[in-house]
Regions:
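GIY-YIG nuclease catalytic motif and its immediate N-terminal context
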Residues: 1-129, 159-241, 276-316
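Short arginine-rich
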Residues: 103, 133-149
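A short N-terminal helical cap/helix-turn-helix that marks the beginning
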Residues: 145-167
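The −1 position to Zn-ligating cysteines in a subset of zinc-ribbon hairpins
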Residues: 227, 243, 251, 255, ...
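Detector for the canonical C2H2 zinc-finger "Cys2" submotif
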Residues: 232, 247-248
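Non-catalytic localization and substrate-recognition regions of ubiquitin/SUMO ligases
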Residues: 243-245, 263, 287
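Cys/His-coordinated zinc-finger cores
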Residues: 249-266
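A short beta-strand-loop micro-motif that forms or neighbors metal/cofactor-
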Residues: 262-280
């Protein structure tokens, strides 16, 4: 499996749970409470009855928190923060030991549970910087002035969760379209009331689903770049194009950014905005993620006539 062949999972449609987004398997099977006892942290997406096309893996950059389930008092309930593009493979490596790719700090100190993961970072650099700050809050210039210390009755995980909430509210991460996912919903703790995640941060539960984007060679699956719906000028380069995540209207990236900023001068691009065509709200990080997907499809496209065209969405 390719490192980046992973994307976001929503709940299993066939399994209805009283808790939104929590697969029934978690509730009905106590053995799946711990990730080292579950078959996978990644649920494969199956497309039945679809014509086979070449695909590109969708990008995934995540920073996770492990909890030790060791029977040894010295290691039990310790936390480990890490970065991954493949949560399933990473937890297997941690529990298999250092020789199998696990970390030095998790070797012989488990088994380990991957309890939560924060994903939606635009690239690996942004995720790795978040990982380092989460590991080293006393050194990170972003939050070191807060002098965050573990309270006497606070569990190691509750302390790490509090640090993560502070980081998600700091630049640049508070401008990203992040998702906080409880991989093991039974381990969920309430977020600190005084430092909740940003309002645009998604909260999800359950597994992460592998996802790929098809590269169709059918002309009918593409549309022309056309004109920007704001300035009415032609969009010359595919790299200049972004589209609304609701109505799929095309814009110059710069035009939509200026429109979304609505006069704000302290930012280069908006965090949230309203589409000038359909008036639906969008998260800028989702718009850019879609743009990156369009460019990756173009790069992998073998039909030169389609390279500068835009893959259709359900809205287009």
């Amino acid at each position: 499996m390719d490192d980046s062949d992973i994307m976001v999972l929503d709940q299993n449609d066939s399994a209805v749970s009283p808790v939104d987004g929590v697969p029934c398997s978690f509730e009905n099977d106590p053995g799946k409470r711990f990730s080292f006892g579950a078959s996978a942290l990644i649920s494969p997406r199956k497309n039945k009855g679809r014509k086979a096309f070449k695909t590109v893996p969708d990008e995934f950059f995540g920073v996770y928190c492990l909890i030790s389930r060791s029977q040894l008092k010295h290691y039990k309930n310790r936390c480990y923060i890490g970065y991954t593009v493949d949560p399933n493979r990473r937890i297997q490596q941690h529990n298999a030991g250092r020789e199998k790719g696990g970390a030095k700090k998790t070797d012989n100190r488990g088994p380990w549970d991957m309890v939560c993961i924060i994903h939606g970072f635009p690239n690996s650099i942004a995720a790795l910087r978040f990982e380092w700050a989460w590991q080293n809050p006393e050194k990170s210039r972003v939050i070191r002035d807060l002098s965050l210390k573990k309270a006497r009755k606070e569990t190691p995980f509750a302390y790490r969760l509090r640090i993560a909430c502070h980081l998600m509210n700091c630049r640049p991460w508070n401008q990203f379209a992040l998702t906080f996912r409880w991989l093991l919903p039974m381990e969920e703790l309430p977020f600190p009331e005084n430092i909740l995640p940003p309002k645009h941060t998604l909260l999800k539960y359950g597994l992460i689903e592998k996802s790929t984007t098809e590269i169709s060679c059918e002309y009918s699956d593409y549309i022309e770049k056309g004109e920007c719906r704001l300035c009415d000028e032609e969009i010359v380069k595919l790299s200049h194009l972004v589209r609304c995540t609701s109505c799929a209207a095309h814009f110059h990236a710069g035009c939509l950014a200026i429109n979304g900023l609505a006069g704000q001068r302290n930012l280069l691009y908006p965090v949230l905005g309203d589409c000038p065509r359909c008036s639906q709200s969008y998260i800028w990080g989702d718009v850019i993620r879609d743009q990156r997907m369009i460019l990756r499809v173009s790069e992998a496209q073998t039909n030169t006539a389609l390279k500068e065209m835009v893959p259709r969405t359900h809205s287009s």
